Amino acid sequence: MSGKKIVSKTTTVGIVVGDYVVLAADKRATAGSLVAHKRVKKIIRIDDYIAMTISGLVADAEIIAEQARFIARKYKLELGRPIKVSALASNLSIILNAYLRMSPYIVQLLLGGYDDNGPHLFYIDLFGSLSEEKYMATGSGSPTAFGVLEEEYRSDLSLDEAKELAFKAVSAATKRDGFSGEGVDIVVIGPNTYVEETKLFKRSIIAK
């Protein structure tokens, strides 16, 4: 696989509940039909209280993540305060759209974070289209995961319930999607909060 970009066919989920954003992603990357890495982090910390999930070409996603970090750092240095989640989302949308006709970045992004205006979750596709959502799923397993979210999401979910729902959505996608698997990384972002945890699948979950 030397010289080839690894394609991350995956499932990522984002949920807004109360003052928090919950992001979740499976832990496997693939190249074609081959499992390239059994455990891969697909939730990238961008700023103190902002993170991004990635699906698509890993190399492209890494470039976008570095640009997001640069934008956040530059904003903080110049203005002395953290960038708003919406402002960062708009910047990433512009970047993706600008490269569309030249060499498009093959990525789908969920940008989640907390700022003075509360929790936010933005979906950004490879065309640079941008939308703010209460819940969303991306990646090869997203149809299944989104179905779970649509059926079970409520605005009054507790934080623990939201974490369980995110895990359930990714787990359901894993049962149907051979490109997602191994376990789930979960990140919770809220007021003065950035917490990472990992839940590995039991054999009964990943068994066909």
Curated annotation (Swiss-Prot):
Q: Name one GO molecular function term.
A: threonine-type endopeptidase activity
Keyword Hydrolase belongs to the record = yes
GO CC terms, sorted = cytoplasm; proteasome core complex, beta-subunit complex
Location in the cell reads: Cytoplasm
Pfam annotation, one family: Proteasome
Domain of life where this protein originates = Archaea
Protein's UniProt name: Proteasome subunit beta 2
The species this protein belongs to is Staphylothermus marinus (strain ATCC 43588 / DSM 3639 / JCM 9404 / F1)
